[in-house]
Design a protein with these regions (language model features):
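Bacterial Sec-dependent N-terminal signal peptides
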Residues: 1, 5-11, 18-59
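Polar low-complexity intrinsically disordered regions enriched in Ser/Thr and small residues
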Residues: 9-17, 325, 375
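Carbohydrate-active catalytic/glycan-binding domains of CAZyme proteins
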Residues: 57-381
């Protein structure tokens, strides 16, 4: 059936045209509103992304404490099985008065920690080695280190023997977190404290160690014990850290211990009285762009410094300060690369209110300048 709508009048036509124009205007307005809303939404998303990026950058660059429920110090960090493992000493409240003989640093065991990423959850794997399990050791399990070779993990640690002389021991495990089984005797020819084992790209491993004052390094010369050992006079060359190639089984030295010489920019040995640059303790070695970086603590001036060289034995030339003084007496550190980023692990005593024997491990991103020098970090951050 056909319906005849009839002829539209001019008024009807005008009304339709007017309504059509209104629809066009409304449509344009909707498009404009949508466009503005879209721009506003995109701007909001952009600003949120910038804010999140800024927060992440702040988190990334701000030093972080590793754990809060246990006091740990002297962290040696390594990458094993695509995780970071940290091997620290374990501080305790020993009830011993703080004195110059450092008996109040009476650590008795080692806990090992791991994480999938910096800033992520940290796993405490519990006690990996206790002084009671080490036949030759008497007390004071100080700063350790670890290494992997031959399908085994090796934990290196200093401890005082039954006669109160510091020796360096080694314990072995099938897993990076332990537990570790100690050798029945310390490493032959070892002495002093703070072992750090570095494996070069050619597969050779070296141990760096030594520490003056309570670390007893001043009681040795050319690897031999001496009577009445003392610090050199201030205008004489300072005591040097020690280095030795490790045996293939990683359980002994493969050679006699050698001095590792640290020179000033003038090419002369750093003097014993140069407390801002001379070696005190806390050896660490890492490699960056083909250069060897030996870093250490200056002890009583509370700085972490570094020197560079062209081979594992040196000599090394002093370059600068990595970390300014922290809250607490001094710091001890390690440097490791993980997934393209370099990190500095160290400790301070801020959480314990400045008690030097109750320390907490921190981690911060480490950066290099174009010339290979290290950008200095503030210890109080």
């Amino acid at each position: 059936m056909r319906i005849n709508l009839g002829k539209r009048t001019s008024r009807e036509s005008g009304t339709i045209t007017h309504e059509y124009h209104l629809l066009q205007i409304a449509s344009c307005q909707l498009k404009t509103d949508y466009s503005q809303m879209k721009k506003s939404t995109l701007l909001t998303i952009f600003l949120m992304a910038v804010a999140i990026s800024t927060i992440n950058a702040q988190i990334k660059h701000k030093p972080l404490y590793l754990v809060k429920d246990i006091y740990i110090a002297d962290p040696s960090a390594h990458v094993f099985n695509e995780k970071i493992y940290v091997y620290p000493s374990h501080d305790i409240e020993a009830g011993i008065q703080e004195t110059n003989n450092v008996d109040h640093f009476n650590m008795r065991d080692y806990h090992i920690f791991s994480m999938d990423k910096v800033g992520g959850p940290v796993t405490d794997h519990g006690v990996a080695l206790d002084v009671k399990e080490v036949p030759w050791a008497g007390r004071q399990m100080w700063a350790p280190d670890a290494a992997f070779k031959n399908g085994k993990y090796y934990l290196y640690f200093p401890a005082k023997d039954k006669t109160d002389i510091f020796r360096i021991g080694v314990a072995v495990s099938d897993k990076p977190e332990g537990p570790f089984i100690p050798e029945t005797s310390p490493i032959t020819g070892s002495f002093s404290i703070d072992p750090a084992v570095f494996t070069d790209t050619d597969g050779k491993s070296y141990m760096y160690f030594g520490g003056i004052w309570g670390g007893q390094l001043q009681h040795y010369s050319n690897g031999k014990a001496i009577e009445c050992g003392a610090q050199p006079a201030g205008d004489k060359p300072s005591l040097n850290p020690q280095v030795a190639l490790m045996s293939k089984d990683m359980l002994q030295f493969a050679e006699n211990v050698k001095n590792l010489e640290i020179l000033g920019p003038d090419g002369k040995p750093i003097k014993s009285g140069d407390n801002d640059r001379r070696f005190f303790e806390a050896s660490w070695m890492h490699k960056f762009n083909g250069k060897y970086y030996f870093s250490y603590s200056t002890g009583d001036t509370h700085k972490l410094c570094y020197a560079t060289g062209d081979n594992p034995y040196g000599p090394f030339t002093w370059q600068g300060v990595i970390l300014t003084p922290v809250v607490g007496w001094t710091s001890h550190h390690s440097i490791v690369e993980f997934k393209g980023t370099w990190y500095l692990f160290y400790h301070d005593s801020k959480p314990s209110g400045g008690k030097t024997w109750l320390r907490s491990v921190k981690v911060a991103e480490l950066n290099y300048n174009a010339d290979g020098t290290i950008k200095m970090l503030e210890g109080t951050d």
